[in-house]
Amino acid sequence: MPKKQKKLSFLLFLSGLLLVACGKEGHSQIVAINNETEYEEVVAKDVAYLYFGFDDCPYCKEFRPILEEELMETGQIAYYYNTKKRVNDANYDEVLDTYGVEFVPLLVRLENGKAVGSVNLDTVADLPALLAAE
């Protein structure tokens, strides 16, 4: 094989490897809620996990990697309710009141729209049990 073909083959291989690696990195077990309709769809599920927080919250930055790791291990998905981005939603106060959100981060387990358990940064050790609850 000529030198030019070897170089081209090698570059194509590296490009493919890079594409595969980048594609895997973008996948997250945490899905953002972008509007009120998406929120309603989440709470209509039999079982769902609702994660309250905001991007520049230092406690959320500590909590989120722990949450992501546990979600990956259990195959669960959490729906992210960004308390700063959703503040103008008509149902914002109702949502926070319904789940007793006084501070973030907070992960709430919902069963048929009702909160049946939650964890925060102080109780993060209980996260595996919350995600494994039947």
Question: What role is predicted for each listed range?
Answer:
Residues D55-Y59, K84-R86, K114-A115:
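Solvent-exposed loop/turn segments at secondary-structure junctions
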Residues L18-A21:
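C-terminal motif of bacterial Sec signal peptides marking the signal peptidase cleavage site
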Residues P2-F10:
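Bacterial N-terminal signal peptides that target proteins for export
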Residues P2, G23-Y49, D56, E134:
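Proteins that catalyze or organize thiol-disulfide redox chemistry
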Residues Y39-Q76:
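Local sequence-structure signature of Cys/Sec-based thiol-disulfide redox active-site neighborhoods
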Residues L96-V108:
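Structural micro-motif
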Residues V108-E134:
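Non-catalytic, surface beta->alpha helical segment in thiol-disulfide oxidoreductase systems
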Residues Q76-A90:
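Thiol-based oxidoreductase modules, predominantly thioredoxin-like and allied folds used
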